[in-house]
Amino acid sequence: MATANSIIVLDDDDEDEAAAQPGPSHPLPNAASPGAEAPSSSEPHGARGSSSSGGKKCYKLENEKLFEEFLELCKMQTADHPEVVPFLYNRQQRAHSLFLASAEFCNILSRVLSRARSRPAKLYVYINELCTVLKAHSAKKKLNLAPAATTSNEPSGNNPPTHLSLDPTNAENTASQSPRTRGSRRQIQRLEQLLALYVAEIRRLQEKELDLSELDDPDSAYLQEARLKRKLIRLFGRLCELKDCSSLTGRVIEQRIPYRGTRYPEVNRRIERLINKPGPDTFPDYGDVLRAVEKAAARHSLGLPRQQLQLMAQDAFRDVGIRLQERRHLDLIYNFGCHLTDDYRPGVDPALSDPVLARRLRENRSLAMSRLDEVISKYAMLQDKSEEGERKKRRARLQGTSSHSADTPEASLDSGEGPSGMASQGCPSASRAETDDEDDEESDEEEEEEEEEEEEEATDSEEEEDLEQMQEGQEDDEEEDEEEEAAAGKDGDKSPMSSLQISNEKNLEPGKQISRSSGEQQNKGRIVSPSLLSEEPLAPSSIDAESNGEQPEELTLEEESPVSQLFELEIEALPLDTPSSVETDISSSRKQSEEPFTTVLENGAGMVSSTSFNGGVSPHNWGDSGPPCKKSRKEKKQTGSGPLGNSYVERQRSVHEKNGKKICTLPSPPSPLASLAPVADSSTRVDSPSHGLVTSSLCIPSPARLSQTPHSQPPRPGTCKTSVATQCDPEEIIVLSDSD
């Protein structure tokens, strides 16, 4: 009897004889009495006679004893889980009787029992191992009936028929196994002979010289060698199956790659199973690794977010790819070559001892390099030619596109399509056409900007010329004003306009006088903005005044108040070259200003009295003036100094005496409605050089005749005012468009 710690030597003959014994499996209570089992176990030996000698080992009793000891150990260690012992007992009952009486099961029980006693903390590991072994050797359901019938028939005294019925079955199994073993041996011998034949043929094909002309031949030596190697691999696999051994040869590519790249063991096991699965050496892609990570996370409920799973899969894919590449590279290095290179040593070169071989190698090397240079130069020239042709085609295509785009912009604009749309239809390459169209549009925009700059420069030059001409004609205008005022003084006309002129002259302060030269310098040095000053001429009130050649009297307009900025009326002025109707009615020889200055009227606000084209005058009188308004920033610079609340725009009225010795400047006081007169904002002036913003279609005098003084005058009687919104002539034509 072998003990638990003894080494058991396996013998195939003993195992076969032990397997040939009927050895019915007894239940656990019967196994506890070895005295009762001795007669039953000795009966088959006595029946077999000489075939069953006393020296033959029987492991059935020993296995039952070891199993009982393991169950007792499990009862003591697994008191918290009483279901473990019945589970092990059921597994042992389901196992095959031949396996229970085998030396393999004895070795397994001895090893498990010794390890469980030495390391009780891992008892469940050993229990699982034993259960796995018993499950692998469990008998089928139809075979479980025989032990049950045997146990049920034993107490009835029918033991000899039972043994007789079991002996033929075992004999048939033994007879069927023996020819199968002999047949497998014949197959193994035949396969080994075939493998030797394949190896010899492969060696012969490897030693054969391979010509370049045989590469396209389906029966070349290289292809024959490849086919024989595939057959050799299949034969080797079949031979390993017959011999019941592993087919691993120890190559690097067959080694298992352990993976511990992540902190989750479940994910590591899944990835390791993916990269080490049997079959062809397939390199997994990122999708395979990501699916493996997602399956592991879903199955084990790791609760990882999608982004973390993706990052983990990316890192794992990089690590796995590097490991697989290294393994494949090492396998190529170790298995490269054939039997001809087995005896090669790096320090042994036959060319060192054979000069003829060395010369032949040098010639072959020079020939190979020359042929390689010829091939490279040939295809380099072809590449240069193709690139040059492509360059010419591209250049011609670009030229055709540019010419087409230059011809079609006008038609495309007329048809409502942009130049880019036409170019994209005419050119096969949309991207190049769009690039050309963008260049054309940029060039057109640059040309338009240059034209606008030229127009602005021309406008500025024309305005400067107009100012110079107006300043030159200042002297003539002043002389004409003197003559007209003298004639008006002699005339006995009692019109409201004449009375206003007389009252204005009486209220003048004689001390406010300046020299003519200083007035001219002041007018020339100051640029009067049309958006800040607003004037309207006083036309003659009767036909007698027109016949006397009276010049319309100028009255000043005060600054616009903040209340007057609510509504503004913008009326386009007449061209510079067009003479006004007042000029034609008064005198054809008299010359008016060439550029009218503008202002904006507010609807309903009182303005300076203005005689319309039909000669009607609307007299209105007001009392004291209202509070002064603030000045704009631009007007502050022009007026020089003075308090903000009392400053206003003054009219310079020059009275030239007949001897031409002095000029009298007559400032006009602010009126309540004049303070409400709006001043046109500088941003409302039109860009056209020949048009401006005016309050009415009446003629406006030259701005050179305007002046500003830093002091204010006391209020005087109100003047006649009229509004352009209520006193416009119905026959007057007012142009409201900015276009030419």
Swiss-Prot record:
| Disordered: region residues | 1-55, 147-185, 384-724
Q: Name one GO molecular function term.
A: enzyme binding
* Entry PTM: Sumoylated with SUMO1 on multiple lysine residues.
Region annotation ((Microbial infection) Interaction with Puumala hantavirus nucleoprotein) maps to 627-634, 658-663
Positions with biased composition (Polar residues) = 149-181, 496-505, 514-524, 578-590, 693-711
Region annotation (Sumo interaction motif (SIM)) maps to 733-740
Q: Fetch the CDD domains from UniProt.
A: DAXX_helical_bundle (cd13151), DAXX_histone_binding (cd13150)
Region Interaction with MAP3K5, annotated ranges: 501-625
Residue numbers carrying Phosphothreonine: 459
Location in chain, cross-link Glycyl lysine isopeptide (Lys-Gly) (interchain with G-Cter in SUMO1) = 630-631
Query: Which stretches are tagged as biased composition: Acidic residues?
Result: 435-486, 551-561
Q: Necessary for interaction with USP7 and ATRX: where is this region?
A: 1-160
Phosphoserine carried by residues: 25, 178, 213, 412, 424, 495, 498, 561, 580, 668, 671, 688, 702, 737, 739
Where in or outside the cell it occurs: the entry states: Cytoplasm; Nucleus, Nucleoplasm; Nucleus, PML body; Nucleus, Nucleolus
Positions with biased composition (Low complexity): 29-55, 529-542, 673-683
Task: Spell out the subunit comment.
Answer: Homomultimer. Interacts (via C-terminus) with TNFRSF6 (via death domain). Interacts with PAX5, SLC2A4/GLUT4, MAP3K5, TGFBR2, phosphorylated dimeric HSPB1/HSP27, CENPC, ETS1, sumoylated PML, UBE2I, MCRS1 and TP53. Interacts (via N-terminus) with HIPK2 and HIPK3. Interacts with HIPK1, which induces translocation from PML/POD/ND10 nuclear bodies to chromatin and enhances association with HDAC1. Interacts (non-phosphorylated) with PAX3, PAX7, DEK, HDAC1, HDAC2, HDAC3, acetylated histone H4 and histones H2A, H2B, H3, H3.3 and H4.
The entry's free-text remark on domains says: The Sumo interaction motif mediates Sumo binding, and is required both for sumoylation and binding to sumoylated targets.
Q: Tell me, in a sentence or two, what this protein's role is.
A: Transcription corepressor known to repress transcriptional potential of several sumoylated transcription factors. Down-regulates basal and activated transcription. Its transcription repressor activity is modulated by recruiting it to subnuclear compartments like the nucleolus or PML/POD/ND10 nuclear bodies through interactions with MCSR1 and PML, respectively. Seems to regulate transcription in PML/POD/ND10 nuclear bodies together with PML and may influence TNFRSF6-dependent apoptosis thereby. Inhibits transcriptional activation of PAX3 and ETS1 through direct protein-protein interactions.
Q: What name goes with this protein?
A: Death domain-associated protein 6
- Which gene is the coding source of this polypeptide chain? DAXX
